[in-house]
Amino acid sequence: MAKLAEQQIHRLTIEGYASGGSGVARLEGMVVFVQGGIRGEVCDVRLTHVGRTALWGRVHEVITPSPARVVPDCPHYGRCGGCQFRHMDYAQELEAKHTRVYDALTRLGGVEHLDLPPVLGSPKVDRYRNKAQFPVSRGPRIGFYQNRTHRVVDVPDCLLQSQAAGRLRQAVKEWMTAWSVPAYDEKSRLGLVRHLYVRTNRRGEALATLVTAT
């Protein structure tokens, strides 16, 4: 078989989930972390990174879909690294999180004979986060880092964040544009604004903090 390399496509079966929400498959004895995979699916996976002991990839095409697969309701999903589960239904998301905890306690923590109860679901599956940390880059782009990178994906509205956080994000973007306030650049180490940090409460009140280079 040819040497494993980035951009190759391999047909794999998703066996489980990793701690970051990616599906887990195996190829030539190596673990493959598959972005967008659901347990039980057969997928054509495009390799995005080849490491010495593990591989990373993303779903190129789903050959045998899981009944839990849904169409993501966020237009930025797949590029934005802010969440990992919008391609599966909520019941499967809870199973994936249960697997994460079980593996951490048994495989990493060494706990034996663990009877772990199911994850309790929330009645509120959107707009439940009360803290947002938005990285800022040239443009300005204000949103979240693309998966496994420091490239900022401009996200006007995150379905997991409060609407107040989204309005503050837009206000800061307009202020930076109107006053030519520069975003911080990690490579040149020039610029000013690095992050926008927002906390909200149940009354709809919000606290915004700008993290700057100086």
Per-region residue spans from a language model:
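Accessory RNA-recognition modules of RNA-modification enzymes
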Residues: 1-214
